[in-house]
């Protein structure tokens, strides 16, 4: 029945600035509606992001309402800190890890490598990549440490 997640929405204070920001991440603008709503493709015809202009973007942050994670390749993730900085975006601390490189959160047979950053309105964003966990590691660590252990 369910094939995937088609759309998600975030509140923004300046629609044009947010369109520029998300276009800079590689999303493609599809259309706008009455200068208050924009839809950008994450993956054409598969998933998109709706940006709603709002006077109430200062909602208290909670990851269940203002968080989007974009799936990226492992190679893309490895380059993500410099890629974000080159675009003028600032990676941020998350789960106690400084944004010097992606970090890994392990689960049983797999793990997620990730880096976090915010959009101009403070919406929480991340680049994430699912990776194998052949040694069933349970500790969180930086990706470079993970790769050293899993050589």
Predicted features along the sequence, with ranges:
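Short beta-strand/turn micro-motifs at beta-sheet edges
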Residues: 52-58
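Short, solvent-exposed beta-strand edge segments and adjacent coil->beta transition regions
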Residues: 3-7, 63-67, 112
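Vicinal oxygen chelate
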Residues: 13-16, 69-124, 132-136, 143-151
């Amino acid at each position: 029945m369910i094939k995937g997640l088609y759309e998600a929405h975030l509140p923004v204070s300046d629609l044009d600035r947010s369109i520029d920001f998300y276009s800079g991440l590689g999303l493609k603008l599809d259309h706008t509606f009455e200068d208050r709503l924009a839809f950008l493709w994450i993956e054409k015809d598969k998933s998109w992001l709706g940006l709603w202009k709002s006077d109430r973007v200062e909602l208290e942050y909670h990851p269940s309402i203002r968080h989007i994670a974009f799936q990226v390749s492992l190679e893309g993730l490895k380059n993500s800190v410099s890629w974000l900085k080159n675009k003028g975006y600032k990676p941020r601390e998350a789960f106690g890890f400084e944004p010097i490189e992606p970090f890994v959160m392990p689960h049983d047979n797999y793990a997620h490598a990730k880096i976090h950053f915010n959009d101009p309105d403070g919406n929480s964003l991340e680049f994430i990549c699912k990776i194998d966990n052949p040694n069933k590691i349970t500790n969180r660590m930086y990706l470079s440490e993970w790769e050293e252990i899993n050589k």
